[in-house]
Amino acid sequence: MKKIKYIIVITFFILKSSYVYSDDNFDVWKINFKKYALKQGISTQTLNRIIDKSIFLPDVIKYDRYQPEFYEDTKTYISKRATNKKIIIGNKIYKNNFKKIDKISKEFNIDKSLLLSLMGIETNFGNYLGKMDIISSLATLSFDKRRSEFFTSELITLLILIDNNIVNSDNLFGSWAGAFGNFQFMPSTIKNYAVDSDKDGKINLKETEDSFASAANYLNSLGWDNTKPCFYKIELNKDIPNSYLNVSAKKIHSTKKVKYLKKYIKNFNFLDKYDVLNA
């Protein structure tokens, strides 16, 4: 009898999962989303042209559940992405664009090395911008339940940008999560921080000047301080338990964990002068 119950339960979840991710169900989502988007001020023309062509992308769900930041320790993550080859490419990018990059670095007070490093990490200096249709990616993630509210908001923002001719809808290919351009900006980041640095009337985040200026503006707006180091060398009184290693910076900033970690760090006074871990 127990086996029968288990079979029924498993079958139910299989059927439920198949239904959630069926093409028919995604089509229903598109109809409902268009109604919602109209109320947000998106034009019917844009919705019919853009959303009607969107498709459900199963791979996007897989990528969302299996991100490198979730399962790779810090050393492995950095060693895979900070290679001598990338340093050579980065130096070449700077050599070919140093006037623009120096100007932007000075204007926004953001270290040029930081900007180049971010570009290298995000897109290998523009050599891999992503091949996913970000409209379909955002639609898939909006349809999915895990972070539907966030991605619905991002999709609405992107449609507003298209409606206002700020971004070109014919060139929207990027990451599985909907990020775009040399520095992988999400739609809300484009809306809030992107800069038309070359004054051509368009924001082109695949072009050097606009993308570097936008990234610099983003960092400046978030309060980046060139006088503070990116990393802090610490000395330990004793080993930190494994459960506290490789947690995100956001989690470390919680008051509870700061107080707990403090007893393990010998040179905590050194960190205090940078106001780190107490933000």
Give residue ranges: language-model regions.
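Short N-terminal segments immediately surrounding and downstream of signal-peptide cleavage
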Residues: 21-41
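Classical Sec-dependent N-terminal signal peptides that target proteins to the secretory pathway
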Residues: 2-22
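Catalytic glycan-binding domains that act on GlcNAc-containing polysaccharides
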Residues: 41-279
